[in-house]
Amino acid sequence: MAKIVFIGAGSFGFTRGLVRDILTYPLLKGAEIALVDINRERLNFARRACEKIVAMGNYPAKVTATTDRREVLKGANAVCVTILCGRTSVWGHDILIPKKYGIDINVGGTRGPSGIFRALRTIPTMLEICRDMEQLCPQAIMLNYT
């Protein structure tokens, strides 16, 4: 059985859509879907949504959830990362600072000045995740949706 970890599982839109799509593949319909997020409330919401997807699709999948990233990475085959470093309130700075200098930016952009701001916030955490993966699931594939 494949183990697929979702780091930043509280990102409800990404998690729900990806889990639903993954479970439609015959090879993955019995996967362990392991959710992790630092926000317990959002994590529990995502867990319940994923459990509902499993139940409604009658998939033999297992859903687990924890706030301990290292615990959930043990033995993972794939890791989907959908993290947001910093709160959504920092996006205002990502948009307003470039706009002050005549550069229009999309919300959540990953290119241009806002992409640089976002990268500077995100890279340290991504490196921590990569180090954990090297130790705990070195064969796993990472898919970054951040």
Residue ranges and their predicted role:
Residues 101:
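Active-site gating loops and adjacent loop-to-helix segments of metal-dependent hydrolytic enzymes
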Residues 1-95, 108-146:
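Metallocofactor- and cofactor-centric catalytic cores in central/energy metabolism, strongly enriched
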